[in-house]
A protein has these predicted regions:
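A broadly conserved detector of short glycine/acidic/proline-rich loop/turn motifs that flank catalytic sites
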Residues: 5, 80, 190
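Glycine-rich loops and low-complexity Gly/Arg-rich segments
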Residues: 23-27, 37-42, 49-53, 78-81, ...
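RNase H-like nuclease fold core
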Residues: 1-60, 64, 68, 157, ...
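Acidic/histidine-rich catalytic cores and adjacent linkers
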Residues: 49-60, 66, 100-211
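Residues at structural and domain junctions
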Residues: 1, 23-26, 48, 84, ...
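Conserved beta-strand -> loop -> alpha-helix junction used to position metal-binding or nucleic-acid-contacting
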Residues: 53-100
Length: 211
């Protein structure tokens, strides 16, 4: 499940079956909230669908809000979070190594990644703990705050980054790539119809998504 936007106040939240590739449900929304994601899952279950697992982008509070359903965080979204903290081409050696490690996410297993992350942290722990003093206030702050935040993000989300591996028999995708590709195709086609008003745009989306 995932959401895409046109502008700031018109979006489509889509629920897709990863096995059959069928679009199951959609909402037109102004704001992406966890409430709508829960509403979607509830509606699907009420219709008789057996929700074996959920793949989502890792919104705050969403990953741990489904008590009885395995949740996989999209590994591409995790990589994007890291890039926002340390950029796509970091200069610090510690950041370069972390960036290279994150690139392995879709290609490795849980034990290998956890072991490599543990080794990275032990290697750079002293560096991460470095502090800088503000000469005007006398207060100190972490010198490499964004790198620390990048590491903390991975460490916090690690529980949900390998749900596919912990439940290998379910065949859970490790990304929301199928939906994102669908959204990209939809947006490309809509660019050829820029003059559509909201009502006609919704009609176009309805016909494209067939749900």
């Amino acid at each position: 499940m995932d959401t895409t936007y046109w502008g700031r106040s018109f979006g489509v939240m889509l629920f897709k079956d990863a096995i059959t590739k069928e679009n199951l449900l959609k909402f037109y929304i102004k704001t992406e909230t966890n409430y709508f994601y829960h509403q979607g899952i509830d509606q699907l279950q009420a219709k008789g669908y057996n929700v074996l697992a959920i793949v989502c982008d890792g919104r705050r509070g969403l990953l741990n809000s489904f008590d009885d359903i395995p949740v996989q965080m999209c590994q591409f979204h995790q990589a994007a979070i890291i890039r926002r903290y340390i950029t796509k081409n970091p200069r610090l050696l510690a950041a370069i190594e972390l960036n290279e490690l994150v690139r392995l996410l879709p290609k490795t297993d849980k034990e290998s990644f956890k072991g490599a992350l543990f080794e990275w942290f032990n290697k750079w722990k002293t560096f991460l703990d470095e502090r800088t003093i503000n000469i005007e206030t006398g207060k100190s702050f972490y010198t490499h705050k964004r790198l620390r935040s990048a590491y903390r993000s991975i460490k916090t989300n690690l529980k949900w980054l390998f749900t596919w591996y912990d439940n290998i028999e379910l065949g859970i995708p490790n990304t929301t790539g199928a939906i994102e590709g669908h959204f990209a195709d939809l947006k490309n086609k809509l660019r050829n119809h820029n003059g559509l008003n909201l009502k006609r745009k919704k009609r176009f989306i309805d016909e494209f998504l067939k749900v």
